[in-house]
């Protein structure tokens, strides 16, 4: 007896594994998972570390080989590194005992997310791709690479790639006769749904810890949704207190830059180059606007919980909830969820338009929403979303017929991803008088106007800009890409940091100063064994954005810091940090070539790091003494590449 099309389709399976630092790779993985579902593959989407090393090394056939194919989606972090939620999986692939046939029979495709302003563009995806091939896996479709520097962002390369990939899957794995792809205008079952919390069970007393589903918590616990009081159970987070939020640029300056100081009571340790990750919150007026538009008023302040949808209830542990730790949130209401977790001011992806098209009965609105999901209308999609930076809240206001069920909030809307900020404090600035840890940040408040003449604000910096001293917020301490050894830190160093890019470099300088002070205390009659230190700082105007100017003289006395500045608007001809390098070829050749020094570059991605790289290559080419070593162009490029490989050339840009 032959199988029915539905029975035959159940043998089609797909696994989508992602490694994501900021959430972009996870969003791409979810979109690829939805694509596979629409082609009738039973699909699982999970972070790479969820495939435990024991499963991978002991039961490979039951895991990776059991799927028709596996899609690996990975972003590159730091200096070509694998994201934290994929590292244990990656390390398990590097075991020396694995034979070259270990992954034979595993069909895979990979997609990487990177930034071409970094020397190691998409390094993580390329490393993973190469290792999978070494272990015998079979690539079923050419890997894709997204570039954050694309004019349309990551989707500029992802959308054409996924469109062609869909056609390839239909050719390679044709659907059983009588079965057709699930069309975009047909809704997929939600993976996770919100539900009213169960009323208190009989015999239980109603205390502060248990409220029935008919009660609201807005009056009883007003602090839960306060912007300046953070109760979110974010995994691996510290509860920090904001002690300073000071504007360091003049009121007349075009940019609002803040020096923000946070403290925690414990003596947490961190190193120069490390980062603080802050998850933003929404403003009450924005949340109320969404509640009003959707008609969620009656539900807004009732207790809710997140539960797996019908398809996930028996799917096993691979499917992690979209918001880790949410079950520990005290008194979770729909309003609290929207305030603390849902990114309603994000620029929508194509998948958002596909999702909300199912929640309107207005045929004109539905047709237009689905047009935005069609690859043939990519330019219109970008003209409507990324180019004017139009937010989800604005889209829903314009497509006012869309009414999303509150139960589907986490399926339709993106969740907040933490924003990373380089720590600016180091050495003696890292500790409070009470022995706790202190984190100082230098943050530019994002606020600008787009082609549709509306003011745009960064979601996280808008949140930070209004926090007052005494506010609490949950922060995650993360390793950064500028980490260095002690020898590198105290050796010859060139630090290049225009604008707020100077933040992690300040941390390095104060760390070097702490080393010098400690050495002098132990060896009062000896000079500290430190190399020359040069800071290249760039800004618009010396009077407006020369951050930490008063500290550089103190550091000059302590560690011999030499500061070069490039203020682009203080004279008729613009000057940038790369111009300083070109004026001092001999100096940079001596420090970085003759003395084997290290260079650290931090600031905006795009033209600056590329221009600095080119200027350094020119310094290696032309900066040598007439009677000393000379490098041709090829040799200069190879020398800089060698610096990268040995960790003497590091870049952190955004």
Curated annotation (Swiss-Prot):
Function: NADPH-dependent reductase which is a central component of the cytosolic iron-sulfur (Fe-S) protein assembly (CIA) machinery. Transfers electrons from NADPH via its FAD and FMN prosthetic groups to the [2Fe-2S] cluster of dre2, another key component of the CIA machinery. In turn, this reduced cluster provides electrons for assembly of cytosolic iron-sulfur cluster proteins. Positively controls H(2)O(2)-induced cell death.
Organism: Aspergillus fumigatus (strain ATCC MYA-4609 / CBS 101355 / FGSC A1100 / Af293)
Domain Flavodoxin-like per the UniProt entry, residue ranges: 14-166
EC number in record: 1.18.1.-
Complex and partners: Interacts with dre2; as part of the cytosolic iron-sulfur (Fe-S) protein assembly (CIA) machinery.
Subcellular compartments: Cytoplasm; Mitochondrion
GO biological process, one term: cellular response to oxidative stress
Keywords linked to the UniProt accession: Cytoplasm, FAD, Flavoprotein, FMN, Mitochondrion, NADP, Oxidoreductase
Record-given protein name: NADPH-dependent diflavin oxidoreductase 1
GO molecular function: flavin adenine dinucleotide binding; FMN binding; NADP binding; NADPH-hemoprotein reductase activity; oxidoreductase activity
Limits of the FAD-binding FR-type domain: 235-485
Coiled coil feature spans: none
Cofactor list: FAD; FMN
Any one of the GO CC terms: mitochondrion
Similarity comment: Belongs to the NADPH-dependent diflavin oxidoreductase NDOR1 family.
Top-rank taxon: Eukaryota
InterPro entries named in the record: CysJ-like_FAD-binding, FAD-bd_FR_type, Flavdoxin-like, Flavodoxin/NO_synth, Flavoprot_Pyr_Nucl_cyt_Rdtase, Flavoprotein-like_sf, FNR_nucleotide-bd, NADPH_Cyt_P450_Rdtase_alpha
Reaction equation(s) it catalyzes: 2 oxidized [2Fe-2S]-[protein] + NADPH = 2 reduced [2Fe-2S]-[protein] + NADP(+) + H(+)
Residue numbers binding FAD: 389, 419-422, 458-461, 654
Residues binding FMN: 20-25, 75-78, 113-122
Residues noted as binding NADP(+) in the record, renumbered to the chain: 500, 568-569, 574-578
